[in-house]
């Protein structure tokens, strides 16, 4: 919104957003690995400061489009690796079966962020200024990072320095499965977003409520099922629920029934991610967990970009219904990945 308002170009705005995603996807595994190498304090504080300053620069500095893209890349590359840090520390905080409940809470909180964040940013941009969400984001990044570090002191957490080569964790079958499944699942979600927005056209409120229905379904699914041991079949069934609800949404008429279908599709989203995170946490050595979760974050970002790109192309070439079916196909692809992986042996 901010870049489009400044430049008058949606193409430039999209390019800046793409550069931000690329920057985060490329850098996150590396910054996550630094957590064990140089420590949480210097890694997180330096990243938060660079990220905050970069967002302030994007908010106030008038520069050509090329420099805006560079700023976007820097913003993405400097995102503090808080998610990998927190998820690597969970086993130290809650042992045993409590870990599932904690990851379920994690994915539920993530759903709240995905629902509230875009709405809040859009409201602030339209009500006050497009620069305000960037200022708010910079403040949240810096204050939130400091708050996390101060809160973590009472647990005396430690992230072990990795003793293996960078990227070697990608050879682990649990990480491969987790990246493939989460990439396809997130791609399904972002493609569905494109389909919903295209289906309801200029009815922004209807589209917003429809997307919120998916988020609420995922939120409830995380609370009710995220703490349970799913197993391979359960994980596949959870992701198949996302696919089935998406297909139903594309086939039914009537706004109320469509909302119900989207709600049903969301029920499997958070439990699936929670199960994936628990699997990685259990199967990866302590010195590699932060890097592994950094790669998972990158995979999710790539999946989101793929889903959005495919959705846009399919909408232009065919119809909103076609995008919704593509979204369902991506979710079904995610659902079969655990079954395929199991044929090669247990993966956790």
Walk through the language-model features, giving the residues of each.
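Helix-loop boundary and gating motifs at the non-cytosolic
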Residues: 1-25, 169-214
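Helix-to-loop junctions at the C-terminal end of transmembrane segments
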Residues: 26-40, 125, 220-234, 315
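C-terminal ends and interior cores of transmembrane alpha-helices
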Residues: 49-63, 241-253
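Hydrophobic core of transmembrane alpha-helices in multi-pass small-molecule transporters
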Residues: 65-81, 183, 258-271
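Cytoplasmic helix-loop-helix junction between adjacent transmembrane helices
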Residues: 72-112
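A membrane-interface helix-boundary motif in multi-pass transporters
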Residues: 126-139, 313-331
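C-terminal transmembrane helical hairpin of 12-TM major facilitator-type secondary transporters
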Residues: 234-276
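A late C-terminal transmembrane helix in Major Facilitator Superfamily
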Residues: 287-320
């Amino acid at each position: 919104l901010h870049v489009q308002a400044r430049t008058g170009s949606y193409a430039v705005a999209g390019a800046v957003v793409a550069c931000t995603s690329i920057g985060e996807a490329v850098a996150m595994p590396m910054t996550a690995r630094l957590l064990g190498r140089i420590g949480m304090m210097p890694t997180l504080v330096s990243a938060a400061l660079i990220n905050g300053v970069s967002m302030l620069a994007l908010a106030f500095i008038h520069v050509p489009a090329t420099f805006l893209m560079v700023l976007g890349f820097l913003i993405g590359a400097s995102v503090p690796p808080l998610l990998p840090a927190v998820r690597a520390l969970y086993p130290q905080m809650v042992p045993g079966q409590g870990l599932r409940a904690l990851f379920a809470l994690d994915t539920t909180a993530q759903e709240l962020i995905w629902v509230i964040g875009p709405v809040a940013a859009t409201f602030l941009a339209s009500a006050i200024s497009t620069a305000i969400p960037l200022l708010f984001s910079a403040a949240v990044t810096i204050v939130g990072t400091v708050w996390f570090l101060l809160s973590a002191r009472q647990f005396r957490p430690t992230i072990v320095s990795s003793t293996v080569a960078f990227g070697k964790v990608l050879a682990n079958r649990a990480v491969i499965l987790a990246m493939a499944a989460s990439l396809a699942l997130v791609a399904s979600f972002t493609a569905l977003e494109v389909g919903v927005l295209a289906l309801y056209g200029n009815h922004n409120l209807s589209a917003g409520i429809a997307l919120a229905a998916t988020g609420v379904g995922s939120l409830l699914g995380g609370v009710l099922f995220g703490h349970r041991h799913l197993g391979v079949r359960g994980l596949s069934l959870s992701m198949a629920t996302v696919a089935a609800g998406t297909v139903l949404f594309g086939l039914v008429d009537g706004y109320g029934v469509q909302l119900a279908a989207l709600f049903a599709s969301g029920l499997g989203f958070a439990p699936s991610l929670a199960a994936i995170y628990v699997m990685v946490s259990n199967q990866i050595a302590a010195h590699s967990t932060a890097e592994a979760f950094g790669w998972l974050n990158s995979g999710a970002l790539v999946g989101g970009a793929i889903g959005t790109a495919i959705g846009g192309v399919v909408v232009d070439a065919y119809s909103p219904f076609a995008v919704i079916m593509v979204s369902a196909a991506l979710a079904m692809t995610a659902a079969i990945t655990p079954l395929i992986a199991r044929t090669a042996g247990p993966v956790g």
